[in-house]
């Protein structure tokens, strides 16, 4: 997430309008400063779940955090990066980060055309207490979560979309974007 902003928030000095990383920037010590990177997080639900970002060195982050090559800092302030990365959050999510030119060029080819999926479903806040009963209730409710089934269905639909897109293109000479208008 935004590590410096989290620190500032903890001491009451967070400014919602200022971020050490700008929109479209990440910081990862594995890659060079200003290097363009492709990021994909699993589960990769749909074609809009890719991020092309610039690796941006932030000295202030290095001052306060002991980053390794496996840690990435990103800006989620006034940016849809969490949706773009398929519901990314800050609890040890994993993501592929690469500077491979073939993958980068393929990602950038239609980057602005693939819309980022957004749910806009606001969760109902449930007041819980730290009791055995509330923990058991939460365990039961989360065990019945359908996220796995939803992700599997999404993958099947994506496979069908790309199969149809490739066959449709071969048969008609039209592009994948024409599918959305039929």
Regions found by a protein language model. Name each.
Residues 85-95, 101-106, 111-182:
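Conserved catalytic alpha/beta cores of large enzymes that bind or transform nucleotide phosphates
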Residues 1-98, 102-115:
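Core mixed alpha/beta domains of very large multi-subunit molecular machines
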